[in-house]
Curated annotation (Swiss-Prot):
Organism whose genome encodes this protein: Streptococcus pyogenes serotype M6 (strain ATCC BAA-946 / MGAS10394)
Stretches assigned to the tr-type G domain: 11-193
A Pfam family of this chain: EFG_III
Domain of life: Bacteria
Catalytic activities: GTP + H2O = GDP + phosphate + H(+)
PANTHER family assigned to the protein according to its UniProt record, in alphabetical order: TRANSLATION FACTOR GUF1 HOMOLOG, CHLOROPLASTIC, TRANSLATION FACTOR GUF1-RELATED
Similarity comment: family membership: Belongs to the TRAFAC class translation factor GTPase superfamily. Classic translation factor GTPase family. LepA subfamily.
InterPro entries: EF-4, EFG_II, EFG_III/V, EFG_V-like, EFTu-like_2, G_TR_CS, LepA_C_sf, LepA_CTD
Function: Required for accurate and efficient protein synthesis under certain stress conditions. May act as a fidelity factor of the translation reaction, by catalyzing a one-codon backward translocation of tRNAs on improperly translocated ribosomes. Back-translocation proceeds from a post-translocation (POST) complex to a pre-translocation (PRE) complex, thus giving elongation factor G a second chance to translocate the tRNAs correctly. Binds to ribosomes in a GTP-dependent manner.
GO molecular function: GTP binding; GTPase activity; ribosome binding; translation elongation factor activity
UniProt name for this protein: Elongation factor 4
GO biological process annotation, one example: positive regulation of translation
Top-level enzyme category: hydrolase
Amino acid sequence: MNSQDLKKRQEKIRNFSIIAHIDHGKSTLADRILEKTETVSSREMQAQLLDSMDLERERGITIKLNAIELNYTAKDGETYIFHLIDTPGHVDFTYEVSRSLAACEGAILVVDAAQGIEAQTLANVYLALDNDLEILPVINKIDLPAADPERVRHEVEDVIGLDASEAVLASAKAGIGIEEILEQIVEKVPAPTGDVDAPLQALIFDSVYDAYRGVILQVRIVNGIVKPGDKIQMMSNGKTFDVTEVGIFTPKAVGRDFLATGDVGYVAASIKTVADTRVGDTVTLANNPAKEALHGYKQMNPMVFAGIYPIESNKYNDLREALEKLQLNDASLQFEPETSQALGFGFRCGFLGLLHMDVIQERLEREFNIDLIMTAPSVVYHVHTTDEDMIEVSNPSEFPAPTRVAFIEEPYVKAQIMVPQEFVGAVMELSQRKRGDFVTMDYIDDNRVNVIYQIPLAEIVFDFFDKLKSSTRGYASFDYDMSEYRRSQLVKMDILLNGDKVDALSFIVHKEFAYERGKIIVEKLKKIIPRQQFEVPIQAAIGQKIVARSDIKALRKNVLAKCYGGDVSRKRKLLEKQKAGKKRMKAIGSVEVPQEAFLSVLSMDEDAKK
């Protein structure tokens, strides 16, 4: 194709993504669009087609973004090339959303006709507006008995400020309104800008590792053209590779002769080293490089940290390789090696949130077959020492001694909770119990309220989301943003078994709850840790001060069983001998700590505050 033909083709390209709150019907709408455009034959069709990971299907959530090319013949008789980029809806995967939106010109905003606007809907709309996307509102699930499309239309206009007069009323499940949506994409979403004759600039928005072909890059071509045989260069590190294959997803990978401006597809170039590619990097041609890199993505900082250790220590290298492969298409995952006296060699990993942590753990266990121990999650604290230094600490075992600490600051988040009016009391009570400060509250409509609190991230990390869902019967929706660091009365609590600190059980706690929490965890550990041949004291300590203690009684053999009658001194001698043996055993004995003990540090949070 000459550049004139390519420019004509470019005018027919539409890149868009679908954004919505969890469960508002995003993946179902994507399925219907694939069916309508006959991208997938009815034989291959299955629900949630784009959610290719087993984990996504089981949980019914989208974790990874997906990019697909479809052809659609519009009412004007022209055939258009659509690139649909599917996005996750959960707060932990906002980074995935921001990446997919950067590869688009338009976004379909799906809102449930019964539930209306939710916290995540808002968060994702603001991301789309930041990227200057054309937003097409779609009111979905209009066939539900509780649907009220007019109310939702007003909500979209009042809360988000979008013109919803032309919002499509649809039901993805029943296939209503799909054609209208496709026509609106043709009319309203702008064609990609960019110059096919300019030097190549392609934005990497995802990548996967293939055992045979190396790292496969998923790219959006912003300027220029790329073909097999070209020599490409990464703009961040200057490394060059020879392109072996380019193509698109339909959802299966299909090879093509070229990818030109506006296209979304994949590039394989025998890239063997995972570290050579980074999501957000710009690909250009080695012999005709672009002047500057594209405006990439902002680097996401992990909010939650936890230790990951293989149960079998010989799996350490396998775990490292697995984490590197996961990091390829999940750029927000960070990790570095660490050792623990209790658990051996492992990694300190940073995650965007608890669901992210959960998903990574499950993917490691499923896809790479590695059994893991996870330590309790913690956040990044700013510890100011007496010699006026400030250290960032994400691992409780690295906390300086209490005598060196001047004060500690912890991260607060701005939590936005949307909830029906009748549950406002429950939400406020929960937020206050989690040390939250009330900011503001406003009514979205007659029944729904938007409550904003400043809450310490450490309190949200535990089980805030579960507690919020259970106290509002699942009606609340929740979104949070990092706010600021504030001074707090925090202390590090150590757990001692048989007089030895177990570093992996240490945690940071607010002074006010320290005694209660110490007491609860000691009692929990007493139930979990099996009895030994000797008595084991379990202690919770802040610095040198013991705040709680409980003893696991020793298992003991009845040494008097064979003494029928006889002298009391004989019995005493046997008992003394047993006692001396137990004492010797206690001095050299070590206590095995089961996996549940580490998890109990997590789950004890709520019992402390009942």
